[in-house]
């Protein structure tokens, strides 16, 4: 898969999700299914969207003991998603177990991406809430390195860190970047953001965009604007 815009379908129900996606006549955008929608609708929402032709990033951010994550990933691998993720803070052994569980008997598997630090986290929150005193960019690079050592395909990171991740882990190591907003848009609860054009320039491989598309007066037009700015 090449560069792409992933729409964060952070809706509460299947009905809302399908009503939104029905607006994209003739288009099958890459979509992210997060906790709210997955927990509300279960695995069937993944099957339904796959049947409609969408690529899917299943964003559940697993973080548990290695054996539990391994077994959970073995279940998720049967859903035929295109990408899924976990928290890099779960350690290298957890990530290795996840990769093993996700790999099917024929050797195929979805892309596995590690979350470094959430884009809602800034230096102050990291120091005060998590008692991590290192600079946030150093923590992100450390987590990215660990994910690379574990054999993962890439990381979720702020677009501010995508270039450094490629420098640290190589150009083929994927960067999936939320925290993307239009220059004339509201940044919401994100702390570390860039525009689609800036994310392209700095080297992001995928951008995850939610409210700037889903809450737009014309979501299709907003999606096309994202694609124009990011993919060209």
Where are these regions (language model features)?
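N-terminal amphipathic alpha-helix/helix-capping segment at the start of soluble metabolic enzymes
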Residues: 1-20, 162-170, 194, 228-232
